[in-house]
Amino acid sequence: MATSRDFGREPPRQQQDSDEAGHTLHDGCQHVSEHPQIDVTAHDSSASALPGDETTVGAATAALDPKEEERDPNIVDWDGPDDPANPQNWPPLKKWGNVAVLSIITFMVPLASSMFAPGIPQVLSDFDTNNPSLATFVVSVYILGLAAGPLVLAPMSELYGRVVIYHVGNVLFIIFTVACALSTNMNMLIAFRFLCGLVGAGPIAIGGGTIADLTTLQQRGTAMSVWSLGPLLGPSVGPVAGGFLSQAEGWRWIFWVLAITAGVITIAGLLVLRETHPGTLLERKTRRLRKETGNMNLRSKLDLQVAPRTLFLRSIVRPSKLLVLSPICLVLSVYSAFVYAMIYFMISTFTFVFQDNYGFSEGIVGLVYIALGLGMLFGVVVQQAIGNRIMKRLADKLNKGKPKPEYRIPPTLLAGFLIPTGLFIYGWTVQYHIQWAVPLLGALLAGMGICIINISTNLYLVDAFTLYAASALAASTVLRSIFGATFPLFALQMYETLGLGWGNSLLAFIAVAMFAIPPLLFYYGERLRSHPRFQVKL
């Protein structure tokens, strides 16, 4: 058996870079036990902003002095770069099985947010209310749960590991979904919808970290694309099934079907999902070696040596600090939150718009959401087709082959044109009762633009905040969920006041104004990231 000294070896540079990059999304704080206050907002102009680049993770590299580790025989690390216990070295079937199951869970949670939308008129009738605010809030309150969940679940995953968060969250999700099906009044339904979102936020909050734990840099793009489809495609697909189900069996059966589906997925998760969090795995290894060797001084390479309460509180505060003090994080989060809110704005009103203006039945109106979903799929295809090519071309042309976060921006220029165009088409063609395929084309174009912007902004945040990418993404996710929850609350009232044409035009004008953000970030983003005034102490 290898001694504890063997676990202090510095891995080869290439593998170490990959590990540092792979643990960035949700484990950035775990490499800084001797440097708890680090400037993270900026990387200088010469640094490659891609995860895994040594200059990009300079703070983490400094905190983990390899020479110091070699001098300390009590540091427990992986058994070299090929250690089979390292999730990045798992067999392909095990690795991609985890990715597949996690992606399915991540798809199901947003699916549940909107699958209920076509049944809202039935709920209002059953509970004897005609309050339009309650109609949209029943959908929105779930998103508020998704906004609150990451603030608690992400820090807990750093203390207890990722897989336990998934399993416990899945079981609680089933319980609260059943409670929704059994609700006897509107307040009860709203409360349990919120709890469903709260406990279901785990895959969205920490799923990116699991993907990063499992995959190498070469594999990560494909895995992240598959996983990221869930939060974007799920809300668009849900109402398709929900429409026919509510028409045939009633709105309560939507929740029964969700509970049954979640039960099957939970069983699959228990059978397939395994812990990938490096801090948790190395801590387990440390405890085992302490028992085997009797050396109580052994400690994990990733052990922060701080109280769990301190780590928990620090992790909760970090996203808020980035959102408030970093202009890059704030601007991108607001931009992505606004366009993401358009999904739920449309979802919460499609039923009323197409039933009132085109006479669609509950079952048929669910098919309307397919247009938005197709737009999302086309957006992923376009992003994958042009994103990496543009980034490589700009890096070769402008920076001697070294990528920068700003090179993620160009695809958003296309998206910034698609969103207002789609909103104008959708709003005015519905206003004048143009054949239903035309407004759906507008919804498709808007969905395509929404998808491209969300993927591009997430990639920018990961590249720019490499060490604390998880916190930057958490900040963006929370703001995005808040926008997604609140926009539907005034959707119907805005349509009643302005009409469908001018109501959607107002949103389109805001999107046009925000179109200035991408070029400004492309030309001035690096300057903002490196400016001393905007360095954030975390």
Curated annotation (Swiss-Prot):
Chain intervals with Basic and acidic residues compositional bias: 1-12, 20-35, 65-74
Annotated Gene Ontology cellular component terms: plasma membrane
How the protein sits in the membrane? Multi-pass membrane protein
An MF annotation (GO) of this entry? transmembrane transporter activity
Mark the transmembrane ranges: 100-120, 134-154, 163-183, 194-214, 225-245, 253-273, 327-347, 362-382, 409-429, 436-456, 482-502, 505-525
Pfam families cross-referenced by the UniProt entry: MFS_1 (PF07690)
**Role of this protein:** Efflux pump that might be required for efficient secretion of radicicol or other secondary metabolies produced by the radicicol gene cluster.
Annotated protein name in UniProt = Efflux pump radE
Task: Tell me the name of the encoding gene.
Answer: radE
Which PANTHER family is this protein grouped with? Answer: MAJOR FACILITATOR SUPERFAMILY, MULTIDRUG TRANSPORTER, PUTATIVE (AFU_ORTHOLOGUE AFUA_3G01120)-RELATED
Give the region (Disordered) as residue ranges.
Answer: 1-35, 65-90
Could you list this entry's UniProt keywords, alphabetically sorted. Answer: Cell membrane, Membrane, Transmembrane, Transmembrane helix, Transport
SUPFAM superfamilies to which the protein is assigned, alphabetical:
MFS general substrate transporter
The family assignment reads: Belongs to the major facilitator superfamily.
Task: Please classify the protein's predominant subcellular localization into one broad category.
Answer: membrane
UniProt-annotated location(s): Cell membrane
